[in-house]
Amino acid sequence: MSENRLPDYLDHIQQAATDARSFVERMAKDDFLADKRTQQAVIMSLIVIGEAATKVMDGYVEFTQAHADVPWRSMRNMRNRMAHGYFDINLDVVWETVQEWLPALLQQLPAVRQDADDEDRNDNCERGISDDC
């Protein structure tokens, strides 16, 4: 049986979203649009978010269905646009994503992560490999 990586993937999403938000903290949109280094850092964070979301979608289908309010598909699609359409990245969309979409995601993640921990604990109990039952 393979190791449950779901909590790790959710942690990657949480960390990358937190990083992206911190990169633009106290920054005006015009400053972001003029700062290539910050743009690159934010874009990389969005790619990490999308990569982890793809792993969750591919490996934990029932979990994503149970958490359909989380924008898994949007995270994956954003990653694909960033990774494969680099010369066509719309920085206005990147800014909007970090300012509006990521705060909402960061509010959702603690409960989603708790559900993943509960599910992992229940699986371990069923397999008899945990004393925390």
Regions found by a protein language model. Give the residues of each.
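Solvent-exposed interaction patches of small proteins and small membrane subunits
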Residues: 1-133
